Amino acid sequence: MEGTGLLTAVLVFLFAAVVAVPIAQRLGIGAVLGYLIAGIAIGPWGLGFIRDVDEILHFSELGVVFLMFIIGLELNPAKLWQLRRSIFGVGAGQVVITAAVLGALLYFTQFAWQAAVIGGVGLAMSSTAMALQLMREKGMNRNEGGQLGFSVLLFQDMAVIPALALIPILAGNEGGANDWVKIGLKIAAFAGMLIGGRYLLRPLFRYIVASGVREVFTAAALLVVLGSALFMDALGLSMALGTFIAGILLAESEFQHELEIAIEPFKGLLLGLFFISVGMALDLGVLFTHLLDVLLGVLALVFIKSAILYGLARVFGLRRSVRLQFAGVLSQGGEFAFVLFSAAFSQRVLNAEQLALLLVVVTLSMMTTPLLMQVIDRILVRRYNAQEESDEKPFVEDNDPQVIIVGFGRFGQVIGRLLMANKMRITVLERDVSAVSMMRKYGYKVYYGDATELELLRAAGAEKAKAIVITCNEPEDTMALVHLCQQHFPNLHILARARGRVEAHELLQNGVKDFTRETFSSALELGRKTLLELGMHPHQAYRAQQHFRRLDMRMLRELMPQHHGDVAQISRIKEARRELEDIFQREMLHESRQLDGWDEYE
């Protein structure tokens, strides 16, 4: 695929995504299923625009690679160590039990025992790309169900390495001393990557940032991601695992958030490409000729996997409210099954018919997951929103609320308690089902649902409410809600939480003036108390705090069009710091002559 052929393929992919995904969202089946359907439409069994599916599928794995890098950035070695019990307990248990059960079923359906073993292991793997995307959409990524799901996926990624090593043994090619030498060299190269990354990456990025050219920083981020992926691929290991480790090595660096911003656009596009490629890989010929076998295989895979995951979640102590979501989101086959089964076919562990059948089962199981999660959502809505009406509209007992609060984590709870203490009528929308369950025990009227859905906002009373307070964890959700409210509820006053300066800039650019950066006010208050401890007069410390607040807000507005780390911004920040020092010096001279303020401020 070269020249104009590549450009044509890119054009077809973009057109398919632009057409299919908005339609899928309007139909309520989700973006992931929209991508899969688009892939079927343009693939060999659809309109036939693209036929070289294997090459596209291999390239599209970069979407998973970028996703794992960003996940690695959000972790650090200490947090990873905290997850060891769930990774090697639940993760290992899920792979071993699922592989044993599914492998036994394959053996009893005329698979040779070698083929049954590798088939069971491959089917035990879940789709990292799909599961993480759905966990983010459903708000699971910050509750215990999402954490446990991530641990299971991480163990599965690591389990691919010994699974690939197992294939030659099952094929009867145990190998000799040369193979052990190759394994030793791979281990040494992997250790070299860890050590080199640990001591070279931060100095590299410091050197690049010093140039003041943002494009070079983005290029360096892409170099690290693609370089670590190709290095691991050359070793015969998981590309996604390599970039995940690279992300962890940079997780505690000062460049963490800027790297996320640089990589995010590529991750989204390539993940979409991955899902389209999976849809293209669906062999409808096998589906038609083995329809009953395929349908039974998909049902068995999803049911058995969900049941095992649900049981493990119960043993692990997961709350009942999140067990269903945890079991459903990991119930499908995964992208690593394509790698394992193809390798097994090349070693003649699987024959052509078995390979085609297993790949179709895996692909269709991936298509069932978005639908299964919608069914689970409906079950949870009925359970936690106490729906009494027979229609299918979202149910919220709004009672004409004055304020709608979206997100009821620690930040949202403080706001809610303050408003309720002042007899304000509020409606709270939260999509973390475990938080809904817990808050209801304490008497809060919290309703389960995704506030980015227009019907839920209407049911919550957005047309009559005076204000909406947005405290979402994800910046994308915050901006989606802002646009939704501005378009459909123009009289609804928007107040929002910003997690940092980048999100604050986005809110300002979209006309939201009432926002609070979550750490800014508390940090200022602690700074004021530090000034008091150092002997500053209370009134003077308060005025210093207010001067700093006003100047920082002015800088936020002035620097809005500029990018973080640009030379112009750095220069303006230094200028503002000097300006602030001059203000404080004048204040101190004035206060030394006339201290007519109060003596205490507590």
From Swiss-Prot:
Membrane disposition: Multi-pass membrane protein
Matching Pfam families: Na_H_Exchanger, TrkA_N
Intracellular or extracellular location(s): Cell inner membrane
Any one Gene Ontology cellular component term annotated for this protein: plasma membrane
Transmembrane parts of this sequence: 4-24, 29-49, 55-75, 87-107, 115-135, 152-172, 181-201, 207-227, 230-250, 261-281, 296-318, 326-346, 356-376
Predominant cellular place of this UniProt entry's protein: membrane
Record InterPro entries: Cation/H_exchanger_TM, K/H_exchanger, K_H_efflux_KefB, Na+/solute_symporter_sf, NAD(P)-bd_dom_sf, RCK_N
Record domain RCK N-terminal: where: 400-519
GO molecular function, one term: glutathione-regulated potassium exporter activity
Keywords: Antiport, Cell inner membrane, Cell membrane, Ion transport, Membrane, Potassium, Potassium transport, Transmembrane, Transmembrane helix, Transport
BP term (GO), one: proton transmembrane transport
Cross-referenced PANTHER family: K(+) EFFLUX ANTIPORTER 3, CHLOROPLASTIC
Protein family according to the UniProt entry: Belongs to the monovalent cation:proton antiporter 2 (CPA2) transporter (TC 2.A.37) family. KefB subfamily.
NCBIfam families in UniProt: 2a37 (TIGR00932), PRK03659.1 (NF002973)
Function: Pore-forming subunit of a potassium efflux system that confers protection against electrophiles. Catalyzes K(+)/H(+) antiport.
Quaternary assembly: Interacts with the regulatory subunit KefG.
The name this protein goes by in its record: Glutathione-regulated potassium-efflux system protein KefB
Organism encoding this protein: Yersinia pestis
